[in-house]
Amino acid sequence: LGDVYKRQLLTSPLRARFGIQCHLEYYDASVLQGIVRRSAGILDVSIDDDAALEVALRSRGTPRIANALLRRVRDFAMVKGEGHIDIDITRIALSALNIDARGLDRMDNRILGTIIEKFRGGPVGLNTIATAVGEEAGTIEEVYEPFLIKEGFLKRTPRGREATELAYRHLG
């Protein structure tokens, strides 16, 4: 019940009532690979180790996303393949879903591309980015930015958001 994304929205006395305060960390690829293999077993689909790792690497460090991607890859394997998930069907499926090799989706790349192409890499304000990409500022800040910052594609400065050298290299 006390799981709140923005703890600062709670008063100090209310925060103090929660006995344990936890901070969730992203999972590393090897742990996620094990989760993907286990979930494949639950879904009764066979998966190669390299395919499980590929799903893990593109899942943004999050088991929920890894499982969602696995289900979509399984669907591709059932329709386009023979029901078995190998590295080729995994890459085809994830490419069709617009999930690139670094786990960025279409909106992640659109945000970075907009900052680079329209605003010369920044700095640019959150509301300006939101208007330019057609997404709510809160969604960008809470859904997309944390991963982009964690992975080193984006940085937040007092003057606004800036694309990093990694973002330029990633988008070519």
Q: How should each PLM-predicted stretch be described?
A:
Residues 1-5:
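Short, small-residue-biased leader/transition segments that mark boundaries at the very start
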Residues 9-15, 21-89, 97-104:
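Conserved C-terminal "switch" segment of AAA+ ATPases
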Residues 53, 64-67, 71, 88-91, ...:
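Non-catalytic, well-ordered alpha-helical scaffold segments
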Residues 75-123, 127, 131-134:
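Conserved alpha/beta core segments of nucleic-acid transaction machinery
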Residues 115-172:
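Terminal-proximal interaction/regulatory segments of ATP-powered molecular machines
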